[in-house]
């Protein structure tokens, strides 16, 4: 079992954030869509997609302010073995 698949975390987070910024006020609803979108745009994003832990954090915290949620979520584990 590979606990933390190797992938380009910075690509996943950047692409997810860029996508979310296209949906002002809808970030919470769009986080998982944007995570899937990032998966198609980042190489080697593994079987589970592009940093799902970050996308989940953004969906919970984003509300109307993507940037403040970004600050909370930037260090979130991509793959949490507890879930």
Curated annotation (Swiss-Prot):
Domain notes from UniProt: The cysteine framework is XXI (CC-C-C-C-CC-C-C-C).
Main location: secreted
Protein name according to UniProt: Conotoxin p21a
Keyword terms, alphabetized: Amidation, Disulfide bond, Hydroxylation, Secreted, Toxin
Classification via Gene3D superfamilies: 1.20.120.1800
Residues with PTM Histidine amide: 83
Compartment(s) where it occurs, according to its Swiss-Prot or TrEMBL record: Secreted
Free-text tissue specificity from the UniProt record: Expressed by the venom duct.
Quaternary structure annotation from Swiss-Prot or TrEMBL: May form a non-covalent dimer.
Domain of life: Eukaryota
GO-annotated molecular function: toxin activity
Example of a GO cellular component annotation carried by this entry: extracellular region
PTM comment text: Contains 5 disulfide bonds.
Modified residues (4-hydroxyproline): 24, 43
């Amino acid at each position: 079992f590979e606990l933390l698949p190797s992938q380009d975390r910075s690509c996943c987070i950047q692409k997810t954030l860029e996508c979310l910024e296209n949906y002002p006020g809808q970030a919470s609803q769009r986080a998982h869509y944007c995570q899937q979108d990032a998966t198609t745009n980042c190489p080697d994003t593994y079987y589970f997609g592009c940093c799902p832990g970050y996308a989940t954090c953004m969906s919970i915290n984003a509300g109307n302010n993507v940037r403040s949620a970004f600050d909370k979520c930037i260090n979130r584990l991509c793959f949490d073995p507890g879930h």
